[in-house]
Design a protein with these regions (language model features):
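Histidine-centered divalent metal-coordination motifs
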Residues: 76, 143, 181, 223-225
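A short, gly/pro- and small-residue-rich
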Residues: 39-56
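Amide-donor transfer/coupling interface in amidating biosynthetic enzymes
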Residues: 2-24, 28, 51-68, 95-211
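A short helix->loop->beta-strand "cap" motif at the edges of active sites that frequently abuts
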Residues: 68-70, 316
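Short glycine-rich anion-binding loops that position phosphate/pyrophosphate groups of nucleotides
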Residues: 31-34
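N-terminal hydrophobic targeting/anchoring segments and the immediately downstream early-domain regions
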Residues: 209-335
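Gly/Ala-rich beta-loop-alpha elbow adjacent to hydrolase catalytic centers
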Residues: 74, 78, 83, 87
Length: 335
């Protein structure tokens, strides 16, 4: 089995980043209603107790874990908040908003007993695999909110007889959620619910093996034109899509990258060559400047051993380079 780690309900990004980086898997548990402001909606009268601190905490955890490819399992509210995090929608109250007849989704039976069926979607999906190809299973039910429109990148994998979503999975990442509470049924010997947790734990075990490989080897991005993409002064400590930077390297466990000055071939007259050399030097100096901005996160490396030493220090190694020899001009000494 897996060893549970309780994460305190805090919203300090640095603290949660450190905690999540040590995890092999994440379970998003049940709880109260989700604040509709996160859905860009006003609260309806049927909305029950919300905890905005918990919402913010859950959303941060989900983003941190998903960006690091950590396997995630959502349960009930965890299933719903996962959908919110990835820009799906949620019913504030299914009974007043679904606009059709519904089952009883808040059972009065004891939690370990199932109260209705769910139908698993046909085709290849994780739930069908976990439940050995079964088309229908029995689940318990304790909710009045539910996934409405499944988030982009996800697909629905189970539905209640009244059409309410009961499960979904990401089409690429190892992320899935269920609306019911398998943690209440598994201890009573329900083999199907045990299989859900076994599946998640196996995913976490594989992720732990992948992390161990990254700890043992040096992972290098051998070429990036980042210095040429950023105009003027830039800051690789800030996360910006489409550009290699420290946050992306940390999330992806990249130990080192070569940041190069790429100068396209131009005229060979003295003035043009000097301009190319000067521009390459300016770009590489901007890379060197990053070390003064982020001395606790990166170091400029010039040898393989320096890369290994920097990795052992928990920092990222940045190597300098040029692409195309135009910046050298006619002087090999410019190397």
């Amino acid at each position: 089995g897996g060893a549970p780690v309780l994460i305190p309900v805090i919203t300090d990004l640095k603290a949660l980043t450190v905690l999540v980086s040590e995890l092999d898997g994440l379970v998003m548990s049940g709880g109260g209603d989700i604040n509709p402001l996160y859905l860009h909606e006003e609260p309806i009268p049927q909305l029950q107790d919300v905890d905005t601190l918990r919402d913010e905490y859950d959303l941060i955890l989900l983003r941190l874990a998903a960006n690091r490819q950590i396997p995630i399992m959502g349960i009930c509210r965890g299933h719903q908040i996962m959908n919110v995090a990835f820009e799906g929608s949620v019913y504030q109250d299914i009974h007043s908003q679904a606009n059709h007849a519904l089952l009883k989704h808040s059972q009065t039976l004891a939690r370990e007993y199932p109260s209705h069926t769910v139908t698993l979607e046909p085709g290849m999906n994780r739930l069908r695999t976990i439940f050995n190809g079964e088309e229908q299973i029995l689940v318990n039910s304790f909710h009045h909110q539910a996934v409405k429109e499944v988030a982009p990148g996800f697909r629905a994998t189970a539905t209640a007889p009244d059409g309410i979503n009961e499960a979904m999975e990401h089409t690429e990442k190892t992320i899935f959620g269920v609306q019911w509470h398998p943690e209440a049924m598994a201890p009573q010997g329900d083999e199907a619910m045990k299989a859900l947790f076994a599946y998640h734990i196996e995913n976490a075990r594989r992720f732990a093996k992948a992390k161990a490989i990254h700890q043992r080897i040096v992972t290098i991005d051998s070429h990036t034109d980042t210095p040429m993409i950023f105009p003027g002064e830039f800051n690789i400590g800030e996360k910006e899509g489409g550009k290699v930077n420290l946050p992306f390297m940390e999330e992806g466990r990249i130990d080192a990258t070569f940041m190069v000055a790429y100068i396209p071939q131009g005229k060979r007259d003295e003035a043009s060559l000097q301009a190319a050399t000067a521009y390459a030097i300016e770009r590489l100096n901007q890379v060197k400047r990053q070390q003064t901005l982020h001395p606790d996160r990166m170091v400029i490396a010039t040898t393989p051993q320096e890369i290994r030493t920097i990795k052992a220090q928990g920092k990222k190694a940045i190597c300098l380079g040029i692409e195309n020899g135009y910046a050298l001009g006619k002087l090999v000494e410019n190397l």
